[in-house]
Amino acid sequence: MSTSQTVHDVIIIGSGPAGYTAAIYAARAQLKPLVFEGTQFGGALMTTTEVENYPGFREGITGPELMDQMREQALRFRADLRMEDVDAVQLEGPVKTVVVGDETHQARAVILAMGAAARHLGVPGEEALTGMGVSTCATCDGFFFRDQDIVVVGGGDSAMEEATFLTRFARSVTLIHRRDEFRASKIMLERARANEKITFLTNTEITQIEGDPKVTGVRLRDTVTGEESKLDVTGVFVAIGHDPRSELVRGQVELDDEGYVKVQGRTTYTSLDGVFAAGDLVDHTYRQAITAAGSGCAASIDAERWLAEQD
């Protein structure tokens, strides 16, 4: 194990809109950020085929193209970007340590931007058809399913909200839930049930998503009788929750009951001095590229001001 003698002003963990925006702002502020992007840079947007709601791109842009442009912009300002995974951190005290392989790096401040991962069904066809009819974001992709028949999978508030939202575009929405009881709040469930475009299939699970090159249908199984059936649809929206990627910092910074990093008020300050968090790692609600980028900006500004106060 080798330890770098350089103490960086700031280390950023994670890429995606939050990490790259933090890197751009930190680099322009002459903080010379060291950024550990992970072995697959760009975050969740790397699997998003079309982004039409990010300001500045009138004709839209693909997720990978948007991330590549953000990455190139960070490089332009000489952020030190490294496609490596962080193995461990020690965030207490005036100098924080970040372990990557057999190297230990040090910094006065750390920005956490590891994001959150959408939960998946884990059925055949899901991974291959992601971006080709399978989605985890109705706000991002609903527009592309105008006048089509689609399904939403889930039983919580997010599933009800996404199903209701998708009725603005889709011809029909079938909400599939593996139980006959829902975790959703009463008001969200009633709102979905009152929508004439939404049909409920309870005690039902998807066993396979079909299509080549795009989704054409799903295979279903009744969880009570075992009876199998098929439903012709062109879209599958998976709304069974997200898992924040906070395991790296568990036991060091304060997390909420769902594992999201807690920040102070409207800032990006965490429970530890000199540690800031941004993007989907802290965001239960919006989970959009533009909001992640905004919080990445805020984290960098918070870190810059905090560092100035320490001098």
Swiss-Prot record:
Cofactor-binding details, from the entry: Binds 1 FAD per subunit.
EC category: oxidoreductase
Binding site for FAD: 15-18, 37-44, 53, 86, 280, 287-290
Catalytic activity: [thioredoxin]-dithiol + NADP(+) = [thioredoxin]-disulfide + NADPH + H(+)
Extra remark: The active site is a redox-active disulfide bond.
Assembly and interaction partners: Homodimer.
Similarity comment text for this entry: Belongs to the class-II pyridine nucleotide-disulfide oxidoreductase family.
Protein name: Thioredoxin reductase
Organism of origin: Mycolicibacterium smegmatis (Mycobacterium smegmatis)
Lineage: Bacteria, Bacillati, Actinomycetota, Actinomycetes, Mycobacteriales
